[in-house]
């Protein structure tokens, strides 16, 4: 029995109690929202990760870190270093490898990760088909489904399943005047398969069986947005919305079967459209968790897309997004280094908390208030220890040596907090004030 079925039966399990304690909300709310599909636990029940990662309504915004080899760069040691970065800064991890021994790489990443690991199974079968049959779209439906099952057996906790795109939507998008017809790698693979085989989406055709597989492991289906906008000029066109409508139907069906499900979102979206993108998705899907790639509010930001997208991510988080998929400085340019993975993850930790201050209010802001209290007291040790990155903060604080006065090296002896404390002492010692 999966966690949704347990919640629907009114059961309160140890996992629900753990979520309640972690997030600081009543366990009855946790149970009720799980039963409605508004909270879920990212896990593979047969191979639990070392970190508990719930996402959804009323919970803190979580951050996903993408790693993985490419056809151009296969360096497993580097990817395992990225896993260490993800363990420190992230909540979930996706292996998007497309080069090397994909089975071995995936298993090594799962073994090294403290976090729930996700994959995009169509990558593997497309690449294997390309190598063995001289064409990526030559795989069979059974081969795709067997790949999904293999990933579940390996302990994968969530998978991007591009089931929302139909053959009609794919053909019309490719013939359209979109700036970039299809930007999703997995979505393009499914579109290519449908066109080559003159057949409907293999995930949709076998949807009941897909649900059965995920139900067995109580793992999470992450419904991919194959037609997400790859340019801000394509945002919220008929193809993105058309796929979302199809996805919403699949969501309802999955929840009816007791299968955990979330929806993936864009992508490239102008700043003024981000909040209502979230509201639209939540409305159409009944409030299931939303997993969003930023979004990027501009298209010209590379190699600073981690900064540009963090702006969009803060707005999307504040508007109700539950899981943020990070971007790195290498986005749109190449495979990221370990350092670039860290830069992206930290940017998204900042964005997630900025959103939570709006979304969760006082519960999230307590952290900021504590830091500000110590800052006002010039209590550097306690203030620095509470920051997002204490180690880096201390390096910056001491980069010109230890300050000669209690203040930092920016204001020195003219620090307003230092002067304010001095004035308070004078006021307290004066009988005339």
UniProtKB/Swiss-Prot annotation:
Name of the molecule in the record: Phosphomethylpyrimidine synthase
Annotated binding of substrate, by residue: 66, 94, 123, 162, 184-186, 225-228, 264, 291
Family as reported in the entry's similarity comment: Belongs to the ThiC family.
Reaction(s) this enzyme catalyzes, per UniProt: 5-amino-1-(5-phospho-beta-D-ribosyl)imidazole + S-adenosyl-L-methionine = 4-amino-2-methyl-5-(phosphooxymethyl)pyrimidine + CO + 5'-deoxyadenosine + formate + L-methionine + 3 H(+)
Pathway involvement of the protein, from the record: Cofactor biosynthesis; thiamine diphosphate biosynthesis
Positions of [4Fe-4S] cluster binding: 408, 411, 415
Required cofactor names: [4Fe-4S] cluster
GO MF term set: 4 iron, 4 sulfur cluster binding; carbon-carbon lyase activity; zinc ion binding
InterPro entries, per database record: ThiC (IPR037509), ThiC/Bza_core_dom (IPR038521), ThiC/BzaA/B (IPR002817)
Entry's cofactor comment: Binds 1 [4Fe-4S] cluster per subunit. The cluster is coordinated with 3 cysteines and an exchangeable S-adenosyl-L-methionine.
Keyword Metal-binding tagged: yes
Record's function text: Catalyzes the synthesis of the hydroxymethylpyrimidine phosphate (HMP-P) moiety of thiamine from aminoimidazole ribotide (AIR) in a radical S-adenosyl-L-methionine (SAM)-dependent reaction.
Positions of transmembrane segments: none
Enzyme Commission (EC) number: 4.1.99.17
Species annotation: Saccharolobus islandicus (strain M.16.27) (Sulfolobus islandicus)
GO BP term (any one): thiamine diphosphate biosynthetic process
Keyword list, A-Z: 4Fe-4S, Iron, Iron-sulfur, Lyase, Metal-binding, S-adenosyl-L-methionine, Thiamine biosynthesis, Zinc
Keyword NAD: no
Residues the record lists as binding Zn(2+): 268, 332
């Amino acid at each position: 029995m999966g966690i949704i079925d347990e919640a629907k039966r009114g059961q309160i399990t140890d996992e629900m109690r753990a979520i309640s304690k972690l997030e600081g909300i009543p366990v009855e709310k946790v149970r009720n929202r799980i039963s409605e599909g508004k909270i879920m636990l990212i896990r593979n029940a047969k191979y639990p990760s070392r970190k508990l990662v719930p996402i959804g309504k009323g919970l803190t915004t979580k951050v996903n870190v993408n790693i993985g080899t490419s056809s151009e760069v296969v360096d497993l040691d580097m990817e395992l270093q990225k896993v260490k970065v993800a363990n420190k800064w992230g909540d979930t991890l996706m292996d998007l490898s497309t080069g090397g021994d994909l089975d071995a790489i995936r298993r090594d990443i799962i073994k090294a990760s403290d976090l729930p690991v996700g994959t995009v199974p169509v990558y593997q079968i497309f690449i294997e088909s390309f190598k063995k049959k001289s064409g990526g779209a030559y795989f069979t439906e059974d081969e795709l489904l067997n790949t999904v099952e293999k990933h579940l057996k390996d302990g994968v906790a969530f998978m991007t399943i591009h089931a929302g795109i139909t053959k009609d939507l794919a053909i019309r998008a490719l013939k359209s005047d979109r700036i970039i017809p299809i930007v999703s790698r997995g979505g393009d693979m499914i579109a290519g398969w449908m066109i080559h085989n003159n057949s409907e989406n293999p995930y949709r055709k076998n949807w009941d069986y897909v649900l059965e597989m995920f139900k067995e492991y109580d793992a999470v289906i992450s419904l991919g947005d194959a037609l997400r906008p790859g340019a801000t000029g394509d945002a919220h066109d008929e193809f993105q919305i058309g796929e979302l409508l199809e996805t919403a139907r699949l969501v309802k069906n999955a929840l009816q079967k007791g299968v955990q499900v979330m929806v993936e979102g864009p992508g490239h979206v102008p700043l003024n459209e981000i909040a209502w993108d979230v509201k639209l998705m939540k409305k159409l899907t009944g409030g299931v968790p939303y997993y969003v790639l930023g979004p990027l509010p501009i298209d010209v930001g590379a190699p600073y897309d981690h900064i540009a997208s963090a702006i969009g991510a803060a707005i999307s988080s504040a508007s109700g997004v539950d899981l943020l998929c990070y971007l790195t400085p290498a986005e749109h340019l190449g495979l990221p280094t370990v350092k670039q993975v860290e830069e992206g993850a930290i940017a998204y930790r900042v964005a997630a908390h900025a959103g939570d201050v709006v979304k969760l209010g006082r519960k999230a802001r307590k952290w900021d208030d504590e830091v500000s209290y110590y800052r006002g007291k010039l209590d550097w040790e306690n203030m620095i220890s509470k920051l997002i990155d204490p180690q880096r903060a201390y390096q910056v604080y001491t980069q010109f040596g230890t300050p000669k006065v209690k203040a930092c090296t920016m204001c020195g002896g003219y620090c307003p907090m230092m002067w304010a404390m001095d004035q308070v002492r004078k006021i307290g010692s004066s009988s005339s004030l």
